[in-house]
Amino acid sequence: MFDTITGIVKNTRDSSSVDALIEALGDILDGSPQGGEISDADAKRIQTEIDKFDQIEYEPNTMRKALQMMILKVSKADQLQANYQLTPDTIGDVVSYIASGLLENRQSLSILDPAMGTGNLLTTVINGLTNNINVEAHPYGLENDDAMFEIAASSFELQQVQADLYHEDAITDVMVPKVDLIVSDLPIGYYPIDENVANFETKAEKGHSFVHHLFLEMAANHLADGGVGIFLVPSAIFKSDEAKSLLKWMQGKVYLQGLLNLPKDLFANEAAQKSILILQKVGGDAKQAEPVMLGEFPSFKDAKGVQNFLTEIDEWRKNNMSK
């Protein structure tokens, strides 16, 4: 259905695939084709697809996965840049599993993704929290890219998830309340507007600053005392020349509770490898875990090995982390 309507719009408008998808999602949510310059025959075809959609009640996760496949298709067709890449479900499921364990005694919580992209990681974690610990989660999302924000907003609406979404740069001042949980597949690279980061402790002494360092600082500022942040970061985050300022900033503000390398076979090369970074905001009942959880996931193809590793994480959490 997504594919059919997107194809009709793309051919009619001679637009990019991602723009066609955005218009198609708008048509589905509006219940009829809204754009002009569509022939009666094409409008009828679109309406037929929308009517089929309206007659079926989809599970939110089914809807998310269908949209995920469509995003992958249009990203490939348009050869979109790396920041359009979706966080794989296997990683999203691991993040939600860890979050569920750390917050298992909560009945409700607030969750933020300050770099939500198309919203796939955030909705994956929300679904996981609901299924794993039956918690009521209220999501907040920030995204600066126009196209990704439009897709994310449509995705949440199609999944019938009530969320507060903001189309803005997370590094500038944002009107998001402090939350209990932050999850994010952080952008990697340099932040281009130096004057926006003048008050950041993690800014570079000279030149542009690492954007993932800035996002960690921003995230900590939006965590409630004792709140948890789970981030996808470069595995070498603490080995760069700029790591000294990051570690200095962390002292007294957040506890480094875990750093778990994702399987090497997920990435093109060692330099591209990512890890799951677990931070906890100082305050409340939070305390430094002893020891910090360090390790590397086995290949996700090794189901038994992954389950054993998750069991190790559970044991570490029960013995070392406050809830």
Regions found by a protein language model. Name each.
Residues M1-K76:
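A short N-terminal interaction module
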Residues A77-T90:
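Class I SAM-dependent methyltransferase Rossmann-like catalytic core
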Residues T87-G92, H208-H212:
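Phosphate/oxyanion-binding active-site loops and adjacent basic polyanion-contact surfaces
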Residues P88-S184, G189, S235:
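Conserved S-adenosyl-L-methionine
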Residues D185-F215, A236:
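Mobile active-site "lid"/loop adjacent to the S-adenosyl-L-methionine
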Residues H208-D265:
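Conserved Class I SAM-dependent methyltransferase catalytic core
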Residues F238-K239, F267-E270, A286:
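Short glycine/serine/proline-enriched coil/turn segments at secondary-structure junctions
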Residues A272-K323:
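Flexible, glycine-/basic-rich loop-and-beta segments that form/coincide
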